[in-house]
Amino acid sequence: MPRRREVAKRIILPDPKYGDRVVAKLVNIIMFDGKKSTAERALYGALEIVSEKVNEEPVKILKKSLDNIKPMLEVKSRRVGGSTYQVPVEVRAERRVSLAMRWLVKYANDRSEKTVTDKLAGEILDAYNNRGAAVKKREDTHKMAEANRAFAHYRW
């Protein structure tokens, strides 16, 4: 890795409709082939569907869903001697949010609904109610970390 200066963090501007950075970041993650307006349309539609079903503010629902997906621990490979250990480490706050968003989008795309809007709405609702594939992924990640707790002293 280069030992030069640290790369400056790009500032993501708040999203135009809800004025929220989390929504803007999620739009960027959903975006495919640079089609931002399509990604925005899909997310805004999903948030509308979800807010109608739950009768709450869309951004509040989204943030609660992401909180239910955020992992606290994960495992990282660490080579010691001739063997590789899966060492449990705490996840940085920024990475927690980023992983939660990526998992939300990934597992939304794997769903069987017809449109991307419906897929996203379904996954956000499931995460809000603490079920669904993205929440299961978080549980599996935590189980892996718990199972490898014996190697926690190899942390760096």
From Swiss-Prot:
Quaternary context: Part of the 30S ribosomal subunit. Contacts proteins S9 and S11.
Gene: rpsG
Family, as annotated: Belongs to the universal ribosomal protein uS7 family.
Role: One of the primary rRNA binding proteins, it binds directly to 16S rRNA where it nucleates assembly of the head domain of the 30S subunit. Is located at the subunit interface close to the decoding center, probably blocks exit of the E-site tRNA.
Record-level GO BP terms: translation
Pfam families given in the database record: Ribosomal_S7
GO molecular function annotations of the record: rRNA binding; structural constituent of ribosome; tRNA binding
Highest taxon in the source lineage: Bacteria
Keyword tRNA-binding recorded: yes
Sorted UniProt keywords: Ribonucleoprotein, Ribosomal protein, RNA-binding, rRNA-binding, tRNA-binding
Gene Ontology cellular component annotations, sorted alphabetically: small ribosomal subunit
Record's protein name: Small ribosomal subunit protein uS7
Native source organism of the sequence: Geotalea daltonii (strain DSM 22248 / JCM 15807 / FRC-32) (Geobacter daltonii)
